[in-house]
Amino acid sequence: MIDEAIRSISKKYTIGGHISVAGGLHNGPARAAVFGFPTFQFFSKNQMRWSSPPLKDDEAAAFKSEVRKYGIESTMIHASYLINLASADPDLYKRSMEAFHDEIDRSDKLGSTFLTVHPGSNPDRADGIRRVRDALSTIGDHAVIILIENTAGQGNVIGTRLDEVAKIIDTSDKKLGVCIDTCHAWASGYDLRDSLEKFIESLDYTIGLDRIFAFHLNDAKREMGSRIDRHELIGKGTIDGGLINLIRDDRLRAKPKIMETPFGEARFEDNLRYMSSKIGE
């Protein structure tokens, strides 16, 4: 059993993690509650397959019941890694759109607060941004808040720079926002370690803090600007203390911060203990 003092860090700073739903979606909330998480992320289906069995009504009802039972304040579904809304390939774009719409439907059926999706890749960055914007314009009415995640800069991915992310969500749709991955931001050249305030100001200026709904809280294995997406345990990587300052920032405290660190649930307690030791609680 994890000490209540450690669990309290999760609640005070709105920290969660990516949780396995092996054995059924309804298992997620109980696993999140072990760490005192007020929020958590999960896959609603196999993230490496295009198709999946339809979500049954009783599965959705059981999940929502467990969310209420454990007092989970918000949930986040991570969309399939196969989706590429920026693709210029007609077949891939069509499959991506179908999968994206399915993710939205599943999110609404499960009552998920957020759905986070990677924008995708395209060697023509302007065309890629346009295609993602077009994709977002087709989704119609939905309850879930859709979040575009910034990327680390590998290959031809779109959304590496904050101004690209801002262009993608340049709309008045209040159910469209951004999830900032700290490892990705660091890998793409933003200094979260020694210039966090400058980074937060950049977020506010280019996107708006009101459009930043959540963070993926990850340290990084590689140096700033590496353009390599390799997550590390909190405090064991190259961002180090910058993440503690981000967690403690009053402007960001209430925003969900989801850990996607190596070994998942097996090391979440280590992450929380490190945070507690550095925060002094």
Swiss-Prot record:
Chain sites annotated for binding Zn(2+) 2: 149, 181, 216, 260
Top enzyme class: hydrolase
Assigned keywords, A-Z: DNA damage, DNA repair, Endonuclease, Hydrolase, Metal-binding, Nuclease, Zinc
The protein's required cofactors: Zn(2+)
Protein name per UniProt: Probable endonuclease 4
Substrates-to-products reaction catalysed: Endonucleolytic cleavage to 5'-phosphooligonucleotide end-products
Role noted for this protein: Endonuclease IV plays a role in DNA repair. It cleaves phosphodiester bonds at apurinic or apyrimidinic (AP) sites, generating a 3'-hydroxyl group and a 5'-terminal sugar phosphate.
Cross-referenced CDD domains: AP2Ec
Gene Ontology molecular function: deoxyribonuclease IV (phage-T4-induced) activity; DNA binding; DNA-(apurinic or apyrimidinic site) endonuclease activity; phosphoric diester hydrolase activity; zinc ion binding
One Gene Ontology term from the biological process aspect of the record: base-excision repair
